[in-house]
Amino acid sequence: MDRLTRILAALTRWGLGLCALVLVLMALYVSLGRELTPLVAEYRADIEDKASAALGMPLQIGELEGNWSGFAPILLARDVMVGSGANALRLDQVRAVPDLWASLLAREVRIAHLELNGLKISLKEAEDGTWALEGLPVQKDQPLDPEQLFNRSQMIQQLSVLESQVTLQPLDHPPMTLTYVGLNLKTGASRQRLDARLTLPDGQPLALSLRTRIRPSQLRDSTVEGYASLPQSDWSKWLPERLTQQWNFSEIKAGGELWVNWTEGTLQSAAIRLNAPQLTGAYAERKPIQINNLALNAYYENSARGATVTFDSLAMNVGETRWESRVQVQQTRATDKVEELWHLQADRLDLTPITPLLNALGPLPQGVATAVERLKVTGGLRNVLLDFRPNATDGTKFGFAANLDNVGFDAYHGAPAARNVSGSLSGNLDGGELRMDSKDFVLHLDPIFAKPWQYIQANARLTWKLDKDGFTLIAPYLKVLGEEGKIAGDFLIRLHFDHSQEDYMDLRVGLVDGDGRYTAKYLPEVLSPALDEWLRTAILKGAVDQGFFQYQGSLSKNAGEADRSISLFFKVHDAELAFQPGWPHVSKVSGDVFIEDSGVRILASKGQLLDTQVSNVFVNIPHVPAGQHTHMYLDGAFAGGLGDGLKILQDAPIGTGETFAGWEGAGDLNGKLKLDIPLAKGEQPKILVDFKTANARLKLAEP
């Protein structure tokens, strides 16, 4: 036990003595350092020579001093110039902290911390698009060796640049100066880190951070993790025209954050969070558009199969409309079994703001831009799927599918206009299909009909084909419910890319259990104005048992009569007709109405005019050449009272009112009537009446 005590006491004494010796040596080391470092100024010329030899270029030091801090000497040089000529590097101050222990082990100079102050460099763009660095000395005729540069950087453990300035000089654009540039670089054999901060010309700070794993012998396998913080600045005034090309931006106020991960020579992952309070710009000479409160969160992932870009949140204000969507783009790389595929999917796309966006910012050909502007697409898409195969040579190169939500578009180049189209859509470049299930559906077959057709419910199946000659739209099944009744139909529309060829349409529409008040909506624009006006005002009401409309021919407004064929048929009962202003209405009419290229024919089996029954009425309004007046020819039988006949003679606009004024009569009246009534105003009708009376009584006003 005593022996152990003595050993512990001896170890304690030796330990305390050793600590005291270390403290004495450290104090001596610090004291000698404090005494000797100021003498460094006397070796300024030697240091210049040594540094010039190491750098391979001249180095001049205006003032050199040394001091001590902690356990390390500090060398402070002012007014330092490296190199010569226009590219000489001038520094206000250089502060170096040598690593004495590492220098002794490596038997060459090692710097623990090198601090540069007042660095001023510039990047200038040449006419060929290359950038040249000015303000840094270079060794002529010596190409850049990355491995040699990396090995030299290992001499400095930490490099700091403070209070510096970088000037960017793009071609044909005012220079841009970045001030208060500060960076800190920590080097290592396998890991490096760079942190930088600078101030933009508007005074906003920008921050960068890079963490790398670089090995000079395996540069391709290097890893870079980067981060950037961008302030809310107006970037439009700093972007050169060569970068924006034909886009003209008057304001790009945006900021955000960016994360990247680069490995094995490619981008492995990235994330961006962007917030742009206001963007204003246009493509070429188009009208500018303003986008407010743009918010974007996007992610990028790379794998062996392909890449994925996810827009987790994409939203903006376009005018008074808030546009939001979530979009994902997936790339499948080509293999021996699978061709390259780009797949896009979106939960919802509001189409209404897209039209002004494409009109203002879309780099579209003039023809496509005109079509987008004329169509004015509205509504939305849900569950959008797009497939793009870059190497495909057939129609499968581009495929799509989506659910339509109240989509609408205007008529353009013979294609019909529609509103509130809902259903499912799928297809590719060769063709596709639309299955429609819509409420409050609107269809406008322009230019055949002046006004659109409105329906309560519509169900249809439409297919289309696209070839090198034109576009074909086919509706083999169309069923709608409107205020006029139940309607079914089909149509075919062919639009040619060559405008010298005639676009045409085949349309058939059938109506059952209809209302005669709405039959005027199916009157085509090609009818003469007088006939069109008569048909729209003559049928006041009635029940349509059956109706049929057919159009075959050209879609051009300037097409001739021989280029189209029109037929319209209605089978009605309990109808009321006002066939001419001033004449009493004919009610309880049952018969058929034919509207054809040759004219209009009405075959009424029965009806009632006042209290007189009419039967076997035939109305004919033949088609006349342009410039001639349209006439209505009426032939029919009647059976009623003499009083009704006198009332017609007194009130009808046939020029007999004064003659039969004041006449009164009673009794039975039967006969036949023929009328020739011009539909143009200002002409007198012609009347031929063959009648007989029975048990009649007639009272004349002036016998």
Provide a role label for each language-model segment.
Residues 58-62, 85-98, 111, 172-183, ...:
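Amphipathic hydrophobic-ligand
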Residues 98-104, 262-264, 333, 388-392, ...:
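Outer-membrane beta-barrel proteins
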Residues 198, 295-314, 434-448, 452-480, ...:
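Strand-loop-strand
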Residues 44, 116-119, 137-244, 251-253, ...:
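Elongated, acidic membrane-bridging lipid-handling scaffolds
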Residues 64, 80, 94, 114, ...:
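Solvent-exposed loop/turn tips at the surfaces of repeat/solenoid architectures
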Residues 26-128, 206-209, 213-221, 251, ...:
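Terminal hydrophobic membrane-targeting helix
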Residues 2-6, 57-58, 74, 78-187, ...:
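Secondary-structure transition motifs
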Residues 3, 8, 12-18, 22-64, ...:
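Extracellular/lumenal and peripheral-membrane lipid-interaction modules
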